[in-house]
């Protein structure tokens, strides 16, 4: 068969790859030795290209378990709550006193990361070797660890022929058209008053999307609908975000913890179940030691069970850090039942995310 033959059909598969490095310096390392399974956790970090995927490093100076008690253990941990796993390879090394890379060790395969799961090397470096070469590896009692992460992105299949641009999804056309009605106040039949600002809207759309608005329109006298409907306890920006969701099913600015704090009560009040789900997702993606307590209180107040579970798991995982915050100390006084639930969650040693996942990589000098 000739190698110069022409192919009638062909295609290709392309994969995107994202790479970034993180350097972590641990000062006064000799005072951080602790015992077996005692860990040190780095600050949260992410790549410049993808801030939504958050990571941290963990070091166990005296090993992650009894088997590795004579070694330094190091791990990479995924912190973000994502809908699908993250596939990544990684490499660790130490920076010595000369600025050189030492003990370069890489994962032999692409690892599948789920939320709170960690992968790494429980026998990264013999502790005796580290301490006996402290002048070189621990200059000024500082341990500097570097990690290079390579994330495998989506795969794209490229067809063999030019394709006519796809027709836009009719559902997107519908939401665009409804969004235009809202944005341009076209053919409106009611007026809503929010903190002194008037917004024109459509009763049929509001009634179809919100059982609260539906009940309001069913029971109000026709005469009263000629005057603006007062919306209480909402600021205009949050109201616009809620209305954008009512008309288009999207909440374009619902990506921060602060906006989610304001939108969740509105979604709960007006019976917008899907918007509550979007709020839960925003909270989960932005969970931190600082806001975990407030997130738990909101989840309990507005009966969002998924978010409450995530908040309890997060607090259990970072119990020592969370318990030092002023928010936690305030909750001890104001919401003792949530403190009890948090301790119950902490006591559940079966939580799968607490168990380190170890890969058997070989150290390479």
Swiss-Prot record:
Pfam annotation, one family: BTB
Entry-linked Gene3D superfamilies: 6.10.250.3030, 6.20.250.50, Apoptosis, Tumor Necrosis Factor Receptor Associated Protein 2, Chain A, Potassium Channel Kv1.1, Chain A
Residues of the MATH domain: 19-149
Domain BTB, first and last residues per copy: 188-255
GO BP terms: protein catabolic process
InterPro entries (alphabetical): BTB/POZ_dom, MATH/TRAF_dom, SKP1/BTB/POZ_sf, TRAF-like
SUPFAM superfamilies: POZ domain, TRAF domain-like
Entries under SMART domains matching the protein: BTB (SM00225), MATH (SM00061)
Record family assignment: Belongs to the Tdpoz family.
Name the UniProt record assigns to this protein: TD and POZ domain-containing protein 1-like
């Amino acid at each position: 068969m000739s190698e110069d033959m022409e192919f009638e059909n062909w295609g290709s598969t392309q994969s995107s790859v994202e790479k970034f490095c993180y350097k972590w310096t641990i000062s006064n390392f000799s005072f951080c030795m602790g015992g077996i399974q005692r860990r040190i956790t780095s600050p949260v970090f992410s790549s410049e290209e993808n801030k939504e995927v958050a990571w941290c490093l963990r070091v166990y100076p005296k090993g992650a378990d009894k088997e590795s008690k004579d070694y330094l253990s190091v791990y990479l941990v995924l912190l973000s709550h994502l809908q699908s796993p993250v596939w990544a390879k990684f490499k660790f090394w130490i920076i010595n006193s000369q600025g050189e890379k030492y003990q370069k060790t890489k994962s032999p395969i692409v690892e599948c990361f789920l939320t709170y799961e960690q992968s790494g090397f429980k026998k990264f470096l013999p502790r005796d070797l580290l301490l006996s070469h402290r002048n070189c590896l621990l200059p000024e009692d500082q341990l500097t660890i570097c990690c290079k992460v390579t994330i495998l992105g989506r795969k794209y299949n490229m067809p063999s022929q030019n394709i006519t641009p796809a027709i836009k999804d009719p559902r997107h056309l519908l939401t665009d058209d409804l969004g235009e009605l809202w944005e341009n106040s076209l053919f409106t039949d009611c007026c809503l008053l929010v903190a002194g600002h008037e917004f024109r809207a459509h009763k049929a759309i509001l009634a179809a999307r919100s059982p609260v608005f539906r009940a309001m329109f069913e029971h109000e006298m026709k005469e009263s609908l000629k005057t603006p409907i007062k919306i209480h306890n909402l600021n205009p920006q949050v109201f616009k975000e809620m209305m954008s969701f009512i008309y288009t099913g999207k909440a374009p600015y619902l990506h921060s913890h602060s906006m989610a704090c304001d939108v969740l009560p509105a979604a709960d009040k007006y019976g917008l179940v899907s918007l509550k789900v979007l709020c839960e997702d925003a909270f989960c993606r932005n969970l931190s030691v600082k806001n975990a307590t407030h997130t738990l209180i909101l989840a309990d107040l507005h009966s969002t069970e998924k978010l409450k579970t995530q908040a309890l798991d997060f607090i259990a995982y970072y119990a020592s850090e969370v318990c030092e915050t002023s928010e936690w100390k305030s909750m001890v006084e104001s919401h003792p039942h949530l403190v009890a639930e948090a301790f119950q969650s902490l006591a559940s040693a079966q939580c799968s995310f607490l168990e380190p996942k170890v890969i058997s990589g070989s150290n390479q000098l």
